[in-house]
């Protein structure tokens, strides 16, 4: 009897999605041959809700190892809206279960980040056979040491910091580089250290703008005519640490700085230190393009292991890497949790030893 396996990619795109899809497909075809059929759900959970899917062939998975983005398309379908019936009167959970049944799926593989995993867990609790795969450049999925896409994003952010050094030095400027990472600062911490940033500001460690300015002035007194500040997009200051997210976001918008902290930090540094300060936001560049060699290997490991889980009929789990071993975690154990940079993180100690200010 043929096994029918569905695959979807949900949430923001990142390097390594296609490499993971390929890893799953090649391993399934190698194990089952003609006794497996792969169904691509288009545009994430949105396609699962609307019944938008297609039958895939082996040809669909050729030449995609190095391809950025996702051949299946993706959309953000927030978990908090999954049980909300909107103006279209669609019961999203019931619709997803219907598509699963109509497509005659034996199981569904969900590639995505924290929100994707929460919905995957919901579907597993609803009785569907679900396997998750951890995708995010933020590296913040609980229960895994690394997610595919993270290392490529760090490489890109590091190159940005590298290039900013020369222009900062030439113009005697302070440069604030905004790195993706809303709730967790892993990309900023890694790229900040790799790129030689002088100040690194993370969501987990509320910064004091006076300490930031003091670090800039201290470098100037020692003869450095520029400073590099790596800022996570989710960084908050000590005042905001006592507020709800909606409250401090509203205050930022009202002040004309936008939702992230970077522009406000730059304005304060220039005002307090007198040094010309500029902002650089690489933005979606960090999510685009071909995955690094590391992420291609990791994606292939994860994809092939997911195929093994399909063979074992082990569902309600997500793939993870722990201590250099690929394992499976139960979805119910990791869904809704965030892997933040802990205070005892070795890289924070390294940064402090190097004289890097953490705000």
Predicted stretch roles:
Residues 99, 110-112, 120-122, 129, ...:
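Accessory alpha-helical/coil subdomains and C-terminal extensions
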Residues 25-58, 126-164:
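Glycine/threonine-rich beta-strand-loop-alpha-helix active-site module
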Residues 1-9, 20-104, 115, 237-242, ...:
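A cross-family phosphate/adenosyl-ligand binding-site feature
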Residues 14-24, 48-49, 93-94, 105-121, ...:
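Short glycine/serine/threonine-rich phosphate/pyrophosphate-binding segments
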Residues 265, 269, 290, 295-302:
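A C-terminal functional module that forms or caps the active site or interfaces directly
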Residues 10-13, 41-46, 76-77, 113-116, ...:
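Short, ordered loop/turn segments at secondary-structure junctions
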């Amino acid at each position: 009897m043929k096994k029918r396996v569905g695959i979807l990619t949900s949430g923001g795109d990142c390097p390594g999605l296609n490499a993971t899809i390929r890893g799953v497909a090649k391993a399934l075809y190698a194990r089952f041959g003609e006794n497996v059929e792969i169904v691509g759900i288009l545009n994430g959970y949105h396609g699962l809700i609307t019944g938008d899917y297609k039958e895939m062939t082996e040809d669909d998975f050729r030449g995609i190892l190095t391809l950025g983005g996702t051949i299946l398309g993706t959309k953000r379908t927030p978990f908090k809206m999954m049980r909300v019936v909107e103006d279209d009167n669609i019961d999203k959970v019931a619709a997803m279960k219907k598509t699963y049944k109509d497509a005659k799926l034996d199981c569904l593989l969900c590639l995505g980040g924290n929100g994707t995993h929460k919905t995957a867990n919901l579907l597993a609790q609803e009785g569907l056979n679900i396997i998750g795969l951890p995708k995010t450049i933020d590296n913040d999925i609980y229960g895994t040491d690394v997610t595919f896409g993270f290392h490529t994003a760090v490489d890109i952010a590091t190159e940005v910091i590298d290039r900013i050094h020369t222009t900062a030095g030439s113009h005697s400027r302070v440069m604030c580089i905004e790195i993706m990472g809303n709730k967790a600062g892993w990309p900023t911490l890694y790229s900040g250290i790799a790129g030689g940033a002088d100040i690194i500001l993370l969501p987990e460690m509320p910064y004091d703008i006076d300490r930031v300015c003091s670090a800039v002035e201290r470098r100037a007194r020692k003869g450095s005519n520029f400073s590099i500040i790596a800022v996570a997009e989710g960084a908050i200051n000590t005042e905001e640490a006592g507020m709800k997210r909606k409250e401090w976001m509203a205050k930022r918008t009202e002040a004309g700085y936008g939702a992230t902290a970077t522009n406000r930090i730059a304005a304060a540094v220039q005002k307090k230190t007198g040094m010309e300060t500029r902002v650089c936001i690489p933005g979606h560049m960090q999510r685009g393009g071909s995955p690094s060699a590391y992420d291609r290997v990791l994606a292939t490991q994860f994809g092939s292991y997911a195929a093994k889980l399909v063979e074992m009929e082990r569902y309600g789990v997500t793939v993870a890497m722990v201590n250099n071993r690929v394992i499976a975690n139960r979805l119910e154990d990791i869904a809704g949790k965030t892997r933040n940079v802990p205070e005892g993180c070795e890289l924070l100690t390294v940064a402090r030893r190097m004289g890097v200010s953490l705000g």
